[in-house]
Amino acid sequence: MYAIIKNGGKQYKVQEGDILLFDRMTLEPKATFEIKEVLAVNAGELKMGAPFLEGAVVTAEVINEGRDKKVITFKKRRRKDSKVKRGFRRDYTRVRITKIAA
């Protein structure tokens, strides 16, 4: 059984027990929450929403919060001293999917 969920403008294909990295959420570790934006569920038969399935809920548990590795962006043009180097670290929340209810 799997589900396709939407969180933070991104879509994820999840199964029970999966561990995902979501954008930072203001929840404590070990807290559980429900994701109601379920786009599709496959439990032997595929059910699609338009855009979301009514009554379908995915339950998840927060494991921890952290920061990703630094992503370097470098832009260089052919003129003298025409370069820019920037770094970015994404804040994330690590989440475990505990239950899929269709």
Curated annotation (Swiss-Prot):
Alphabetical list of InterPro entries matching this protein: bL21-like, bL21-like_sf, Ribosomal_bL21, Ribosomal_bL21_CS
PROSITE patterns to which the protein is assigned, alphabetical: RIBOSOMAL_L21
One GO biological process term: translation
Keywords (A to Z) from UniProt: Ribonucleoprotein, Ribosomal protein, RNA-binding, rRNA-binding
Pfam families assigned: Ribosomal_L21p
Source organism, top-level taxon: Bacteria
Keyword Ribosomal protein recorded: yes
Record-level Gene Ontology MF annotations: rRNA binding; structural constituent of ribosome
GO cellular component: cytoplasm; ribonucleoprotein complex; ribosome
SUPFAM superfamilies in the record: L21p-like
Function: This protein binds to 23S rRNA in the presence of protein L20.
Subunit structure: Part of the 50S ribosomal subunit. Contacts protein L20.
Family: Belongs to the bacterial ribosomal protein bL21 family.
Listed HAMAP family: Ribosomal_bL21
Xref: NCBIfam families: L21 (TIGR00061)
Protein name in the entry: Large ribosomal subunit protein bL21
Taxon lineage: Bacteria, Pseudomonadati, Campylobacterota, Epsilonproteobacteria, Campylobacterales
